[in-house]
Amino acid sequence: MRLLVVLSRVPYPLEKGDKLRAYHLVSRLAERHEVFLFCLSDQPIDPEHVKHLQGICQHIEVVHLPRWRIVLRLITAAFSRLPFQVAYFHQRHAHRRFNEVIASFKPEHVICQLVRTTEYVRHHYELPKTLDYMDTLSKGMERRTETAPFYLRPLLRAETHRLIAYENLMFDLFDNNIIISAQDRDFLYHPDRDHVAVIPNGVDLSYFSPREGERHHDLLFTGNMNYPPNIDSVLFLARRVLPLV
């Protein structure tokens, strides 16, 4: 089967959770299918990273999103109902290139990671589609609103409502929906959320295995520390859990 996988980031190197999930998804799918990896990027990409990805899938395209176009897109999004997180990653030149890939590759199925990428396939009704929500972005935005400075709360609250509406819209447009955890599935506002398939993350035991030797750390927390839930987790661990140990 010809599969087109659409990502909002280049999934290498593996320093963020969405990259890790996408990397292993693509590598496993490419073992049995012809995979075209379509990536968006708002920063320069090391050619060696692209070369590495060429070794795990048959085709790859990286479309650069210039900063000035991102700013312009966010300004225009203020006068629409499109969530800013979606507008950030959606640009006309990228959409044109995406449509060219559709025409030339002729995918039999499209897989989008996060609703940030779904605007590209929104009007391709003829294509079977799967959306990996990963987590519920609207719930994350709602939580950020609670702790944000007062002057940012109206903006974040508006983004929360936009995300809820958009997540529900994409739910209906996609043939299949998957998510990482049952908890995140329950945070979706769609009445048919129980139909979302839960596919959790795992650990590659062929790569990660216990090692003998002296231990220099009793505990290590690793993750993207620009991501608010990770910050909350490590603070909870330090303040509430470690004092009990």
Language-model segments: residues:
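Acceptor-binding helix/loop patch of EC 2.4 sugar-transfer enzymes
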Residues: 8, 67-84, 88, 129-169, ...
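Short N-terminal targeting/anchoring amphipathic segment
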Residues: 98-118, 127-130
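N-terminal subdomain of nucleotide-sugar transferases
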Residues: 1-61
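Conserved catalytic-core segment of nucleotide-activated headgroup transferases in glycan assembly
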Residues: 172, 194-245
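A conserved catalytic-core segment of Leloir-type glycosyltransferases
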Residues: 39-100, 104-105
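Short, charged/polar "capping" segments at the starts of alpha-helices
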Residues: 43-49, 119-120, 139, 185-188
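Cofactor-binding loop segments of dinucleotide-utilizing enzymes, especially the Rossmann-like FAD-
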Residues: 8, 40-42, 65, 182, ...
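Donor nucleotide-sugar binding/catalytic pocket of nucleotide-sugar-dependent glycosyltransferases
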Residues: 130, 138, 156-209
